[in-house]
């Protein structure tokens, strides 16, 4: 439903130079049903960047893949590496001792090609030099794209799929009825959508041919699956679709009927050592520094941000969901105005949802 608060948030973001395109939305559970409001560029498909990670985690939870399975059971390139013997849950919870990022796409910069097997092995060997020794709950939490790249590949191979987005389409997107509103580039284009006209443009990258439109912005995701979603990034979505995903996650966590039925509680539970959970992040406690979630969402809120300027937050106590999607990297990632804008924007959406 069109909502003035969402339109106002989008307008302020645009006029403040945060991003050329902004879509905002909120949802609240009241009187046994979900109420929603959206505004701004609703209907535009945004590159969700790392907001793909919660979808991947839910896909793992809803598959037959066990979170206690070792990575090397499913990804042969990981066998004999420091990561191969770790359970998938630690990869999803950013507690596998992996580097945050490795430039797996580097061969493309010099006209080479990507050897996917070599890339997966390289990712699995990327143990941080300061990782230390693991405890029963894994290594100290360090945010890592690589863990999701590897967990996504484990999911794909377990399900007999080419890439994780095929599994997510069946396990998450189809049950939500969001085909055409949420998916990888190839899935959306297979439904006849022209992403060149309905996807928000992202960065102007000369080595990739200029302004990126309808293809994932993340370099590693593009290198590993040019039109797919390897696990850490690659999905596109409308703000209404991201809200619907958040609603279904909260319904499942609360034990209500949900298209995403199954045990998702292990994904969102708090873990020792930091705010990072499996597929989601949590709010920093007062005194631990600023939080992009703002001040209105409760202390137990969980969600995720995306590098392209996207976000999803879920408050399980107030039973509200907020999302903001932007293309803040257009035309350049150097625009970081969103860092100051996110808290007040999330506050405005959460206040509206609370009414």
Stretches with model-predicted labels:
Residues 7-48, 58-59, 67, 107-110, ...:
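A short, well-structured edge-of-sheet supersecondary motif
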Residues 67-82, 175-176:
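Short, glycine/proline-biased beta-turn/loop segments that scaffold the active-site neighborhood
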Residues 2-5, 48, 52, 56, ...:
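Hydrophobic (often cysteine-bearing) scaffold residues that line and stabilize catalytic clefts
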Residues 303-355:
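Structured C-terminal helix/loop/strand segments within mature extracytoplasmic catalytic/sensor domains
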Residues 1-8, 288-295, 348-355:
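Short, positively charged
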Residues 9-10, 24, 53-60, 91, ...:
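Residue-level preference for non-acidic, small/hydrophobic
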Residues 45, 70, 85-89:
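Alpha-helical scaffolds flanking conserved acidic
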Residues 19-21, 29, 33-34, 81-300:
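Short, surface-exposed loop or secondary-structure junction motifs
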């Amino acid at each position: 439903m069109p909502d003035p608060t969402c339109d106002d948030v989008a307008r302020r973001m645009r006029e403040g130079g945060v991003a050329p395109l902004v879509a905002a939305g909120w949802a609240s559970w009241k009187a046994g049903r979900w109420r929603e409001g959206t505004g701004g560029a609703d209907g535009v498909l945004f590159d969700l960047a790392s907001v793909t990670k919660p979808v991947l985690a839910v896909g793992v939870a809803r598959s037959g893949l066990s979170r206690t399975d070792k990575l090397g059971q499913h990804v042969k390139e990981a066998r004999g590496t420091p990561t191969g013997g770790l359970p998938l849950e630690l990869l999803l919870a950013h507690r596998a001792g992996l580097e945050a990022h490795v430039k797996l796409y580097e061969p493309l910069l010099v006209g080479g090609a990507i050897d996917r097997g070599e890339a997966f092995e390289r990712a699995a060997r990327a143990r941080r030099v300061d990782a230390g020794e693991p405890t029963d709950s894994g290594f100290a939490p360090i945010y890592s794209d690589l863990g999701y790249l590897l967990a996504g590949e484990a999911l794909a191979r377990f399900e007999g799929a080419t890439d994780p987005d095929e599994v997510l389409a069946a396990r998450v997107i189809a049950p939500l009825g969001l085909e055409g509103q949420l998916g990888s580039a190839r899935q959306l284009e297979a439904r006849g959508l022209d992403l060149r006209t309905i996807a928000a443009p992202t960065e102007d990258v000369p080595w990739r041919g200029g302004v990126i439109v309808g293809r994932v912005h993340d370099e590693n995701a593009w290198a590993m699956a040019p039109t797919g979603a390897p696990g850490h990034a690659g999905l596109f979505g409308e703000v209404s679709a991201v809200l619907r995903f958040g609603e279904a996650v909260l319904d499942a966590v609360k034990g209500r009927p949900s298209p995403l039925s199954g045990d998702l509680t292990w994904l969102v539970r708090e873990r020792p050592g930091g705010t990072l959970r499996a597929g989601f992040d949590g709010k920093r406690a007062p005194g631990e520094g600023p939080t992009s979630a703002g001040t209105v969402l409760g202390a137990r809120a969980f969600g995720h941000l995306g590098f392209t300027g996207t976000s999803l937050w879920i408050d399980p106590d107030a039973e509200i969901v907020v999302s903001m999607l932007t293309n803040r990297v257009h035309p350049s990632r150097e625009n970081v105005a969103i860092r100051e804008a996110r808290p007040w924007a999330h506050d405005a959406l959460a206040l509206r949802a609370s009414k």
